[in-house]
UniProtKB/Swiss-Prot annotation:
Residues 26-817 are extracellular. Glycans are attached at residues 64, 129, 200, 210, 242, 309, 340, 472, 513, 567, 669, 694, 731. Activated by proteolytic cleavage of the flexible loop between repeats LRR14 and LRR15 within the ectodomain. Cleavage requires UNC93B1. Proteolytically processed by first removing the majority of the ectodomain by either asparagine endopeptidase (AEP) or a cathepsin followed by a trimming event that is solely cathepsin mediated and required for optimal receptor signaling. This is Toll-like receptor 9. InterPro entries: Leu-rich_rpt, Leu-rich_rpt_typical-subtyp, LRR_12, LRR_dom_sf, TIR_dom, Toll_tir_struct_dom_sf. It comes from Equus caballus (Horse). The gene is TLR9. GO terms for biological process: activation of innate immune response; canonical NF-kappaB signal transduction; defense response to virus; inflammatory response; innate immune response; positive regulation of B cell activation; positive regulation of B cell proliferation; positive regulation of immunoglobulin production. DNA binds at residues 47-51, 72-77, 95-109, 132, 152, 179-181, 208, 262. Residues 866-1011 form the TIR domain. The keyword Cytoplasm applies. Coiled coil: none annotated. The keyword Glycoprotein applies. Disulfide bonds join 35-45, 98-110, 178-184, 255-268, 258-265, 470-500, 764-790, 766-809. SUPFAM superfamilies: L domain-like, Toll/Interleukin receptor TIR domain.
């Protein structure tokens, strides 16, 4: 049966290929290969390195496609027919296919070609993104277009014909067509009235284009005009004369303060910018005005006259440190909701006090005030007194001000405040209230260095599964990244309504004993991560009766102190605690033997050393057993190598989510999941599992989500997942699977909602079963067309599993064997008759001539052959020369030339002992075809070298054979007259050792030729013909 089976295998493969082809015709394969169909009619072709727009088959539901994204491919040419097949296409994204040279990662120039009817063939198109492409003109566009993005292109001119016919256009973005990353050496030219025909245009953005004036005759329908980061340093009423519908105007960054710039900056000219008093007075509908980074020192109240609807004002990154203490510009802005004054600092100066101007009290609708980066060191009631009368104020940003004294009790006068950010300051503790007078320029000035202006590290966000956010709480105070060493109750006096307090990234090293937070009777969330807390007292945090979330992560220093005990019994005395994080503390010994709580829902214990704790016999075996209501438990990064059933059995039975990511688990007892009857999510990603073979998921388990990604799984036993009937999400990505078998799942396969098998080295052999299976469950496989790729064979490695051509899907080894055999038969069948007909007698004659010649030639060679190809002569007293001869010359000529190896005669190796020196020398000279002289210098030659040279000259006179070859190792030997004469007569017999390693290969080739050919072939015929043999 074996031979028959082998003969029928190609036929079966052809049948399978035909079946797959039929499946393709019936639409079983993903319809938009190589792209992916996503919800709401979006076809995602991003990051596929496509060089042309894919043409989808007629069987695909092309009429359902409303959005096509071709982001970050390599499409340089768009044809008229590329999108014509998509009759209902509304959104098209072609961003970053052919970026200009300045924006390309390798700075390669690129020009995109767009044929005239490419977009006109799509009359339903409404949104088009051509940004980050090397186009120089606006292509022909359909009249249906509503949104057009031409940012970061090479378009440098707009005239009335550029956008003609686009009467429906509402959004036009042309940012960054001429700036430091996309240089052009000029400015974007917008001809007067070029956009006037766009009667419905509401949004226009021309940022980063080197503009020096506001384009003239803009459409009066504009509501959003963004002109930031150009070079417009003068604004007059006529610049915005007809734009009475404007709601948002951004003219920031046109006259920059370069001491705070994060990119190339041009200093603002002296006495600029020049803003006319009535520049904005006619913009009665204006709601947002951006004047950031404009080198403003004063605020003219007339600028804001008539702006009764202004709700957002951005004045950040200016020089308003004096102005904000006495300005009256805010008196008429009763509707203002957001005001940004950040980084209005004096260069290299930190002031002692700051007192806001009384006009701030007129901002009755203000909800958010950003004052970070103004640099004042004291925060008192006087500082924010005008804000106390603002009933709507909710968010106040005061971070990065180098505040070292802060009276936190002043915030009791702000009943509407929901969020106060005092992070990244230098607050070290409570201060007594003091009366402070004087303006911002009063008091002592402290000069700052560049190091002081460096921002601190960002906080590490916590997963909301284990630590809730404060965004929904009514009052939050952020004191993270300050200089707190201890926490005193006086700091929070009169802040009883505080619900969230962040104290992370300080240096708090005290032993909390239940008295530090007494005034905070309403506190629900407390963040003390990244500190040095000493958890010794059993009543820690018990003064917080409403505490629900406590973050004690990254407090590892006390736990690393040998011999010091730690008390976690306070957890049992927090009756409302729901979330607790003890992550990344390195907890390994001398802690409470058990955590107890009836209220705790989520515990993050990642980044500790449970492996060491559970290795201490039964001491910590029941460490988590007392958490009766625990639902979520994170045990990631605990250096666990095994997880015994007794360990799982002592976890809380109420657990629904268990994370064991990034441990060292090479084995997991799946049957022990019955010990956790309520477990719904198990995360084993990033471990060292090699196979899912020891048993299977138990029957009756409640498991719904299983993550075993980033392991090394190469095998899954049949039926492993079949009994877990409630399993809906399975992540098998980033393993070593070569196939995905339907037998793993049984009847469960149809119930899966997510099956991730990406980043596995799947073996894409002909008739691979996993292809049919993945097609059956393709709705559950994320990124099936693009992210599920082949790992073998080599020609398909890294390509989609659908990349192979079904017509070529044959047995590869059999194909090669048949091809080789047929080629050999054809070649022999053609060659033999042809050779016999054309040159049969010649071949017969050459064959017999060769038989007669070979023995005679061998006898003649034996009679005339010499013992050595070359006799090597050198000065043994020079160790460097001797080392070069033995370790370089000998190895190269005798060992590395293979069949062309030369036979060298060396004095110390080949001279016969017992003979005189002259006898050995005579025999060596006359038994060698050539004499190779290796010289370091040619000015002093004596001893054996001189005698050998004289014998070579004698041989020249007697036998008329020039056998001398010179190898000169030192460059100063070129001064020798003999060397220069011999170079002139017989250049190939004088070789110089090259200084550069790149020339050594040529040197050895020249030396081999010099030793194997007669010197008479090397003589310069212009001077002589060389020695000739006597007749």
């Amino acid at each position: 049966m074996g031979p028959c089976h082998g003969a029928l295998q190609p036929l079966s493969l052809l049948v399978q290929a035909a079946m797959l082809a039929v499946a393709l015709a019936q639409g079983t394969l993903p319809p938009f290969l190589p792209c992916e169909l996503q919800p709401h009619g979006l076809v995602n072709c991003n990051w596929l390195f496509l060089k042309s727009v894919p043409h989808f088959s007629a069987a695909a539901p092309r009429d359902n496609v409303t959005s096509l994204s071709l982001l970050s491919n390599r499409i340089h040419h768009l044809h008229d027919s590329d999108f014509a097949q998509l009759s209902n296409l509304q959104k098209l994204n072609l961003k970053w296919n052919c970026p200009p040279a300045g924006l390309s990662p390798m700075h390669f120039p690129c020009h995109m070609t767009i044929e005239p009817n490419t977009f006109l063939a799509v009359p339903t198109l409404e949104e088009l993104n051509l940004s980050y492409n090397g186009i120089t003109t606006v292509p022909a566009l359909p009249s249906s277009l509503v949104s057009l993005i031409l940012s970061r292109t090479n378009i440098l001119q707009l005239d009335p014909t550029s956008l003609t016919g686009l009467h429906a256009l509402r959004f036009l973005y042309m940012d960054g067509n001429c700036y430091y990353k996309n240089p052009c050496g000029r400015a974007l030219e917008v001809a007067p009235g070029a956009l006037l025909g766009l009667g419905n245009l509401t949004h226009l953005s021309l940022k980063y284009n080197n503009l020096t004036t506001v384009p003239r005759s803009l459409p009066p329908s504009l509501e959003y005009l963004l002109l930031s980061y150009n070079h417009i340093v003068t604004l007059a009423p006529e610049d915005l004369a007809n734009l009475t519908a404007l709601r948002v105007l951004d003219v920031g960054g046109n006259c920059r303060r370069c001491d705070h710039a994060r990119n190339p900056c041009v200093e603002c000219p002296h006495k600029f910018p020049q803003l006319h008093s009535d520049t904005f007075s006619h913009l009665s509908r204006l709601e947002g005005l951006v004047l950031k980074d404009s080198s403003l020192y004063q605020l003219n109240p007339r600028w804001f006259r008539g702006l009764g609807n202004l709700t957002v004002l951005d004045l950040s990154e200016n020089f308003l440190y004096d102005c904000i203490t006495k300005t009256k510009a805010f008196q008429g802005l009763a509707q203002l909701r957001r005001l940004n004054l950040s980084f209005n600092y004096h260069k290299k100066v930190s002031f002692a006090h700051l007192t806001l101007a009384p006009s701030f009290g007129s901002l009755l609708s203000l909800q958010e005030l950003d004052m970070h980066g103004i640099f004042f060191r004291s925060l008192s009631q006087k500082t924010l007194q005008p804000l106390a009368r603002l009933p709507m104020l909710q968010r106040l940003y005061l971070q990065m001000n180098f505040i070292n004294q802060a009276q936190l009790g002043i915030f009791k006068d702000f009943p509407g405040l929901r969020y106060i950010d005092l992070s990244d300051n230098r607050i070290s503790g409570a201060v007594e209230p003091v009366a402070t007078t004087g303006e911002v320029d009063g008091g002592k000035k402290v000069w700052l260095t560049s190091r002081d202006l460096t921002p601190g590290p960002l906080d590490t966000p916590s997963s909301e599964d284990f630590m809730p956010s404060c965004k929904n709480l009514s009052f939050t105070l952020d004191l993270s990244r300050n200089n707190l060493v201890t926490v005193q109750p006086e700091m929070f006096a009169q802040l009883s309504r505080l619900q969230c307090l962040r104290l992370s990234h300080n240096s708090i090293s005290q032993a909390v004993n239940g008295s530090q937070f007494v005034p905070l009777t309403s506190l629900q969330v407390l963040d003390l991560s990244h500190n040095k807390l000493d958890l010794y007292h059993g009543r820690s945090f018990t003064e917080l009766p409403r505490l629900e979330a406590l973050d004690l992560s990254y407090n590892s220093q006390p736990f690393s102190m040998r011999g010091v005990g730690h008390n976690l019994s306070f957890v049992a005395q927090l009756p409302t605690l729901r979330y607790l994080s003890l992550a990344h503390n390195g907890i390994h010994s001398r802690v409470s033997q058990q955590l107890c709580s009836t209220s705790l829902w989520a515990l993050d214990f990642s980044g500790n050393s449970l492996s060491q704790m559970w290795a201490e016999g039964d001491l910590y075996l029941r460490f988590f057993q007392g958490l009766r209501s625990l639902i979520r438990l994170d045990l990631s990064q605990n250096r666990l190598h095994t997880l015994l059933p007794c360990t799982l059995g002592n976890l809380p039975k109420s657990l629904q989510l268990l994370r064991l990511r990034n441990n060292y688990l090479a084995f997991f007892n799946w049957s022990s999941l019955t010990l956790l009857p309520n477990l719904e999510t198990l995360d084993l990603a990033g471990n060292q599992l090699k196979a899912l073979s020891n048993g299977s998921l138990p029957s009756g388990t409640q498991l719904q989500r299983l993550d075993v990604s980033r392991n090394s799984i190469i095998f899954v036993v049949p039926g492993f997942f079949a009994l877990a009937t409630r399993l809906r999400e399975l992540n098998l990505s980033a393993n070593a699977l070569r196939t995905v078998e339907p037998s793993w799942f049984g009847f469960l396969a149809g119930s899966l909602e997510v099956l991730d098998v990406s980043a596995n080295p799947l073996h894409c052999a002909c008739g691979a079963a996993f292809v049919d299976f993945l097609l059956q469950v393709q709705a559950a496989v994320p990124g099936l067309p693009s992210r599920v790729k082949c790992g073998s064979p080599g020609q398909l490695q890294g390509r989609s599993i659908f990349a192979q051509d079904l017509r070529l899907c044959l047995d590869e080894s059999l194909s090669w064997d048949c091809f080789g055999l047929s080629l050999l038969v054809v070649a022999l069948g053609l060659a033999m008759p042809m050779l016999h007909h054309l040159c049969g007698w010649d071949l017969w004659y050459c064959f017999h001539l060769g038989l007669a010649w070979l023995p005679r030639r061998g006898w003649q060679r034996g009679a005339d052959a010499l013992s050595y190809d070359a006799f090597v002569v050198f000065d043994k007293a020079q160790s460097a020369v001797a080392d070069w001869v033995y370790n370089e010359l000998r190895v190269r000529l005798e060992e590395r030339r293979g069949r062309r190896a030369l036979r060298l005669c060396l004095e110390e190796r080949d001279w016969l002992p017992g003979k005189t020196l002259f006898e050995n020398l005579w025999a060596s000279v006359y038994s060698s075809r050539k004499m190779l002289f290796v010289l370091a210098h040619t000015d002093q030659v004596s001893g054996l070298l001189r005698a050998s040279f004289l014998l070579a000259q004698q041989r020249l006179l007697e036998d008329r054979k020039d056998v001398v070859v010179l190898v000169i190792l030192s460059p100063d030997a070129r001064r020798s007259r003999y060397v220069r004469l011999r170079q002139r007569l017989c250049r190939q017999s004088v070789l110089f050792w090259p200084h550069q390693p790149s020339g050594q290969r040529s040197f050895w080739a020249q030396l081999g030729m010099a030793l194997t050919r007669d010197n008479r072939h090397f003589y310069n015929q212009n001077f002589c013909r060389g020695p000739t043999m006597a007749e």
